[in-house]
């Protein structure tokens, strides 16, 4: 994923749409992310499966883990987050620069949200339609949900101990000092 952010920068992209390869994100729904970015410019727009009239339903253990993760992430980021594992994003160029320098490898969505907020970037969520998974398997399965949750919570806790990296901060990048 980080290589994609770096390539987008090298190509001069002002924005990048990121979506998971499991078929859950209908590409046509990207219009909603773009409309949100035009209406209220921000650094990241996340397509959330938990919007008004959502028909998304995961198994009970997944729903419980994601609700707990969303609550914890919302608290540490001081921003309401409903879908901490969504891989459907519209990323602005300044945030691309940050992610080209720093991007988490283990639990990228939740850790990236914590990272971008720590570095001073802003984000919004927009409800989008999600389809059932078309390919692959979720990394969050019923038996492994507790293990997944424990690892993500630990990663987020450790992330809170890190200081802001000036090279990847919103203030530094938006003043035109970043590569």
Q: Model-flagged regions — what are they?
A:
Residues 6, 76-79, 101-179:
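Hydrophobic helical membrane-anchoring modules
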Residues 20-24:
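The conserved acidic donor/metal-binding loop of glycosyltransferases
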Residues 16, 26-28, 89, 115-117, ...:
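A ubiquitous, low-specificity "background" feature that marks scattered single residues
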Residues 25-26, 126:
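Hydrophobic alpha-helix-in-membranes signature
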Residues 1-11, 15-17, 27-106, 133-152:
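Acceptor/aglycone-binding surface of glycosyltransferases and processive sugar-polymer synthases
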